[in-house]
């Protein structure tokens, strides 16, 4: 079975419910499939596919899939420099950029990172699930604050959050993407 659309104008130029439906089909048709997403992830990071699957398990994602775009290995530093050539930001690359477009045309972009224990924490012998946020290496704190200073919310996940990662991530996505206009 298949559906074929022959249009005389772009789906974005069609208003009303028909326009929304056509735009939904267009976004989903253009959206990369999971295999393409996995191929674009960092092969040296075994947790990126895990984070991607956690994103897809959240109620927020399931309810808004047609309004969400996920970009793996996003060069946020280069992107910010394109928008503002005077920006003083290193060429940061993040695990994922999640773009959410609400029904009113507002776009929210959120940076998502999985922090591996051995690379992102200092004094690892003292780190546990109650204090991990105090043991991030200085570079990670600076990176997060720099990116947030340009208006991009930053969500970090790590091994201490995996037991309830779907709920944790869902709460933050709801907070950043569904905040009142």
Question: Which ranges hold each PLM region?
Answer:
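Nucleic-acid endo/exonuclease domains
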Residues: 1-181
């Amino acid at each position: 079975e298949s559906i074929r659309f022959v249009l005389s104008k772009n789906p974005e130029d069609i208003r009303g419910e028909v326009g929304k439906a056509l735009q939904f089909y267009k976004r989903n048709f253009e959206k990369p499939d999971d295999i393409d997403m996995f191929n674009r992830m960092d092969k040296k990071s075994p947790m990126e596919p895990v984070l991607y699957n956690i994103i897809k398990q959240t109620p927020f994602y399931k309810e808004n899939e047609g309004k969400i775009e996920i970009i793996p290995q996003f060069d946020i530093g280069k992107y910010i420099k394109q928008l503002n050539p005077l920006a003083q930001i290193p060429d940061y690359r993040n695990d994922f950029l999640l773009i959410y477009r609400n029904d009113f045309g507002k776009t929210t972009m959120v940076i998502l990172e999985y922090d591996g224990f051995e690379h992102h924490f200092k004094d690892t012998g003292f780190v546990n699930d109650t204090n991990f946020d105090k043991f991030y290496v200085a570079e990670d704190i600076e990176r997060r604050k720099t990116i947030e200073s340009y208006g991009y919310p930053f969500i970090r996940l790590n091994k201490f959050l995996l037991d309830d990662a779907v709920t944790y991530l869902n709460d933050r996505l709801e907070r950043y993407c569904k905040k009142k206009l």
